[in-house]
Amino acid sequence: MGRIENDNQDVSDDGSIIRVKLPNKRIREQFAQAELMLGSNHIRVRCSDGVTRLGRIKGKIKKRVWIREGDILIVVPWDFQDDKCDIIYRYTTPQVDWLRAHKYL
């Protein structure tokens, strides 16, 4: 039987399916890289538009996901202060490899 492909998933080299969340440009989400841990749930991030912002880890992912320097993230810049943003998602290593292979990063 043939294999059914889905638009939301891709098969990696070892045969496992990788699902990757992409930034939604309509709500100003963008890629960023964690540069410096500042403590108290704040991180300095370099966004894909070239701006360095102060990122705040949202309460939803505060205790569930550990963010380290160098991690690739999805952030949403604030409407009223462009030098600050909310961190809403962290990519795992296989997801980052997939993003690089498909030229998103």
From Swiss-Prot:
MF terms in GO: RNA binding; translation initiation factor activity
Q: Start and end of every S1-like domain?
A: 18-92
Is this entry keyworded Protein biosynthesis?
yes
Q: Which UniProt keywords apply?
A: Initiation factor, Protein biosynthesis
Q: Which domain of life is it from?
A: Archaea
Keyword Protein biosynthesis included in the entry's annotation: yes
Query: Could you tell me which Pfam families the record lists for this protein?
Result: eIF-1a (PF01176)
NCBIfam families from the entry? eIF-1A (TIGR00523), PRK04012.1-3 (NF003084), PRK04012.1-5 (NF003085)
Membership in a protein family:
Belongs to the eIF-1A family.
Q: What does this protein do?
A: Seems to be required for maximal rate of protein biosynthesis. Enhances ribosome dissociation into subunits and stabilizes the binding of the initiator Met-tRNA(I) to 40 S ribosomal subunits.
Q: What is this protein called?
A: Translation initiation factor 1A
- Species name for this entry? Methanocorpusculum labreanum (strain ATCC 43576 / DSM 4855 / Z)
